[in-house]
Amino acid sequence: MNTRDPGLAAIPDVQATPDTRRIAIQRVGVKGVRYPLTVKTLSGVQPSVGTWNMYVHLAEEQKGTHMSRFIALLEENTQALDVNVFGGMIRKMLALLEADAGRIEVSFPYFINKTAPVSGVQSLMDYEVGFNGEIKNGKLEITLKVLVPVTSLCPCSKKISAYGAHNQRSHITVQALLADDLVVEELIAQIEAQASCELFGLLKRPDEKYVTERAYDNPKFVEDLVRDVAVMLNNEARVLAYTLEAENFESIHNHSAYALIELDKRLA
């Protein structure tokens, strides 16, 4: 019986009955829950809407988990997300669900107010961001994921052409296992600095001239992108391990160029 609410004592609790098949379930819970959140920024907090996946391990003798308690956890959380708050949510989930292992994943749009390089006009730029966290064998690990759109310009095209060079939008995706709190826009800014040029939501003509020439003066293959971001991540003490991907949506082909680097700095 579920005795957390004395008023429910007389109502049968089927999920709390024993299961005779004796098969443990690695993950059971709720998936694709859209729920508001706030996230920590360098200047304060930012509201957003998260898509949540929340799972726990279910022991072989238990028939079911307490599905409503996942949503109750989201209702109870009023703190802005950072590494410490997110880790606390995972620990609280295990206590509420009476489980010894579990995982929470959340993804959400994140906006940064950016200033154009010449005119100084300001505009919002959106990014795809997420936290993934898991407690297993008593150990907590939290990963910050960011997808950062940038500009890349082809060094070969620049070298062989009398004028101009093909360029395109690229996506740099980093999943970083964190040792300490790392504010989202800190990581995004460090990634953007490795591209041919960063992107902006709004540019005036002097800005467009600047970003065009900036990319032309800073050509990079997809291999250059991942290697330069990897150097940055290798020097970032708050990152323990990472998976790093770059995809160039080639402007002269109907396919993408792609590169990946994975490193666990704890083993290096």
Swiss-Prot record:
The name this protein goes by in its record: GTP cyclohydrolase FolE2
Pathway: Cofactor biosynthesis; 7,8-dihydroneopterin triphosphate biosynthesis; 7,8-dihydroneopterin triphosphate from GTP: step 1/1
Major enzyme class: hydrolase
PANTHER family with a match to the protein in the record: GTP CYCLOHYDROLASE MPTA
Catalytic activity: GTP + H2O = 7,8-dihydroneopterin 3'-triphosphate + formate + H(+)
Coiled-coil annotated spans: none
Top-rank lineage group of the source organism: Bacteria
UniProt-listed HAMAP family: GTP_cyclohydrol_B
Source species: Janthinobacterium sp. (strain Marseille)
Pfam families in the cross-refs: GCHY-1
A molecular function (GO) term: GTP cyclohydrolase I activity
InterPro entries assigned to the protein according to its UniProt record, in alphabetical order: GTP_cyclohydrolase_FolE2, GTP_cyclohydrolase_FolE2/MptA
Function comment: Converts GTP to 7,8-dihydroneopterin triphosphate.
Residue numbers marked as site, May be catalytically important: C154
Keywords annotated in UniProt: Hydrolase
Family from the record: Belongs to the GTP cyclohydrolase IV family.
EC numbers on record: 3.5.4.16
GO biological process, one term: tetrahydrofolate biosynthetic process
